[in-house]
């Protein structure tokens, strides 16, 4: 039986999303994304999702980032603009997968917030490719180049 996530308080939902059972958290994450795709019901939870960006695991950090970015299309209060430094701090994460997910998510952010392109560009130059294995640093460099191209348009 599928839980009705939209009836949960922010605190209850965040508890589920930060559950130590990663499989359960992943399932809930996918359901939240499905809901965000169709509705702004979780926009009031933006700050709670933003708090996940500083989470203990890379999964938590990526979730928080991706939820905030997904909510950009409903962002009537310019919360993304205010949270941008916190969100983009993940571009310095120790996990290369986190960097790649963030870079990919930024593409959808600028679709709804094109005014942020010039603010995002300088952050891309702060990514230290030297701290990742060559196989990953090559992929991250490619992601950065593609995103810079998109942001420069």
Identify the role of each PLM range.
Residues 1-30:
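N-terminal "cap/leader" segments of large eukaryotic alpha-helical scaffolds
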Residues 2-6, 34-44, 72-80, 109-120, ...:
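Flexible loop/turn segments at the boundaries of HEAT repeats in alpha-solenoid HEAT proteins
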Residues 2-6, 121-153:
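Eukaryotic acidic, Ser/Thr-rich intrinsically disordered low-complexity regions
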Residues 12-14, 48-50, 80, 84-88, ...:
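Buried hydrophobic core positions in alpha-solenoid tandem helical repeats
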Residues 20-22, 56-58, 94-96, 132-133, ...:
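Short inter-helical turns and helix N-cap capping residues of alpha-solenoid HEAT/ARM repeat scaffolds
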Residues 30-31, 66-70, 104-107, 142-147:
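Residue-level signature of alpha-solenoid helical repeat scaffolds
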Residues 52-93:
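Helix-adjacent hinge/juxtasegments
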